Amino acid sequence: AAIGGSTLILITTLLLAVVYRKRSSSSKLHLMNSTSSKVEKFLEDYTHQMPTRYSYPELKKITNNFADKLGEGGFGVVYKGKLARGNLVAVKILDQSRHSESQFMNEVATLGTIHHFHLVRLLGYSFEGFRSALLYEYMANGSLEKFIFVEGDVLGWEQLYSIALGAARGIAYLHDECNRRIIHFDIKPHNILLDADFTPKVADFGLAKLWGKGSDHISITATRGTPGYVAPELWSRNLGPVTDKSDVYSFGMLLLEMAGRRRNIDVRASRSSQLYFPEWAFKLIEKGELETRLKERGSTEMGSEDEEKVRRMTKVGLWCIQYNSNDRPSMSRVVQMLEGNGDDVTNPPMPFNSTPSPGSTIAIFYRRLFVDGLTGS
């Protein structure tokens, strides 16, 4: 009887497991079908503006059966490919997750409808059920990140300055010049790509949002971006509305990393005062010692014109990361400041608030900035 009872329990458990798996599979299939219908409706609405659509078998042919992997990120894997007419492309195969749907539509809705010399071009896309992919122009030199965080000054100051100015022009176009304003929300060295001639192009619009020209702010439900580049108002709504000035903050952090040729938060810094580069750079500017100290760190000669470029990049970067978003310049103004035309950039005020109390909103922001930036969490 005991054996019979055990057998009955086992059979019942197995039957329940089978039923659960069937229901789970059915639920997943329903979700996939729902997602597929949503994306297809979106593509139908944008069809008159869309780049070329490719089938999955065509993607396999373009990438030689996904033979040449270029890299892997949070949203998928990127492969090198070649179109029939000979153009080299980067093919991003998106992960099958709830985030890939929104990233796919974000990229198509933004890059699929705009064109600018300093924005990476979306050349095509693929969507078949749960499989989606995006095809971009191929950027031979990869991301800016691998050139500014390495030992030895691979890029000269003039080249770095040109890259900074080009990236600024691309972002300014998003904010002020295209038909529908776009906030990128993830400006950082990894998302500035360089072609064979080191022309910079802003990439990765997976977190981007369209922003109506009549609106004075944008609504978001969660913090967007990468720790270390995220503006204070994105951490806490008490610090002001989210606007295009959030991108300005991120660009400022990027610009400072280019000027310092190091990460803004560097746990390997020889002195604690140099741990956070923006604060150290601000103090050096106040003392008039910026160029001298950066010369000591660099491996290439720095002439007077180079010194001017570094000084300008640093000052503009510090203006961009002002704690109060109203004190930050627009990206169009940033372009003007970088172009210079002989005019010096005025010294920025202290970008950071005075040392906050441990429980204040400001303290929470700085704790997140440092802890998340250092740990990558």
What kind of feature is each model-predicted range?
Residues A1-L135, A140-A167, G214-T221, T226-P227, ...:
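Membrane-proximal cytoplasmic juxtamembrane segment of single-pass receptors
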Residues G4-T7, S26-K41, V89, S272, ...:
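Intrinsically disordered, low-complexity cytosolic regulatory tails
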Residues R169-I182:
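Protein kinase catalytic-loop region centered on the HRD/HxD motif
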Residues K201-D204:
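Pre-DFG segment of protein kinase catalytic domains
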Residues L207-K209:
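Activation segment
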Residues D247:
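Conserved catalytic-loop aspartate of Hanks-type protein kinases
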